[in-house]
A protein has these predicted regions:
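Short hydrophobic "strand-cap" motifs at the C-terminus of beta-strands
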Residues: 139
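Gly/Ser/Thr/Ala-enriched C-terminal appendages of enzymes
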Residues: 127-129, 134, 142-254
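Hydrophobic residues within beta-strands of alpha/beta enzymes
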Residues: 44, 108, 136, 158-160
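Buried, small/hydrophobic-residue-enriched core segments of structured protein domains
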Residues: 1-131, 142-146, 152, 187
């Protein structure tokens, strides 16, 4: 188990000393590089979704990463579709990029969806491709109960990255938000980027945006409408609101 909690820690000191406490408590490594430097803790980690989203396609992102870190290539395979895109592209990189260099794919990481099911399917795909030594790392709001459940389900997971449930206490919870690339500027043009996920709430809205805030007759804010940068919203009449997490829920504002 590795400490992945820095971005959800309450401040920098909490991230650094929390990593130290995690290792004292049994974690084998941390993704917080500063803690590794200060306390001689083994450092481990994988790529971020932003790395994958920056490039035009997933294979190119994996290839660039593998060439940069050939001895420690762990690929994050859930940016778009784990079983139909992520794992197949990881296998392709292992065969076409790493093996010609005399290297092996160290691992893949699952960060959303049904981790037990996906890990079993991914394990079979890797084994069938001759990558039985490729490890599977799992993360996504894990705690001791979730990990115990995954083990009981026979999940094919070799290691766990635990963040917010390790580095913060339940009495002082974290704000559940993420920061993803929405667009990449190329020659003055903003090219939209999207994060697809097995968890609907993790799917991002691509492109440069603007926000309209809706107030009621008592001047109380009741909704925010998200629109594209060049999209014009007619505010003199009715405006339809669609809940991004529950698209079947619609509401009209005037």
């Amino acid at each position: 188990m590795s400490d992945f909690g820095a971005r959800r820690a309450h401040n920098m000191d909490a991230a650094v000393y929390g990593a130290r406490a995690a290792v004292i408590g049994g974690a084998t490594s941390t993704a917080t590089v500063l803690a590794g430097q200060m306390f001689d803790i083994p450092v481990s980690g994988t790529m971020a979704h932003s790395w994958v989203m920056f490039y035009k396609d997933e294979f190119t992102a994996f290839e660039k990463y593998a060439r940069l870190y050939p001895d420690a290539t762990v690929l994050l395979v859930d940016t778009y579709d784990v079983l139909h895109s992520g794992v197949p592209n990881a296998i392709r990189v292992a065969k076409e990029v790493l093996e010609p260099m005399g290297k092996r794919l160290k691992g893949i990481r699952l960060d959303s969806g049904d981790l037990a099911y996906l890990s079993k399917r991914a394990r079979k795909m890797l084994d069938d491709a001759g990558l039985k030594d490729c490890r599977i790392v799992a993360s996504n709001s894990l705690d001791e109960f979730t990990i115990q459940s995954l083990v009981r389900q026979g999940a094919c997971i070799d290691s766990f990255g635990v963040g917010e449930r390790l580095i913060t206490s339940k009495s002082e919870p974290v704000f559940g938000a993420v920061y993803k690339i929405a667009a990449v500027e190329e020659d003055g043009i903003f090219d939209p980027r999207i994060k697809i996920s097995e968890n609907v709430e993790k799917i991002t809205n691509p492109g440069w945006k603007q926000i309209y805030r809706v107030y009621d007759e008592n001047h109380k804010a009741i909704a925010d409408l998200l629109a594209g940068r060049d999209e014009e919203i007619e505010t003199s009449g009715e405006v339809e609101y669609v809940d991004p997490n529950k698209p079947w829920k619609h509401r009209l504002f005037t």
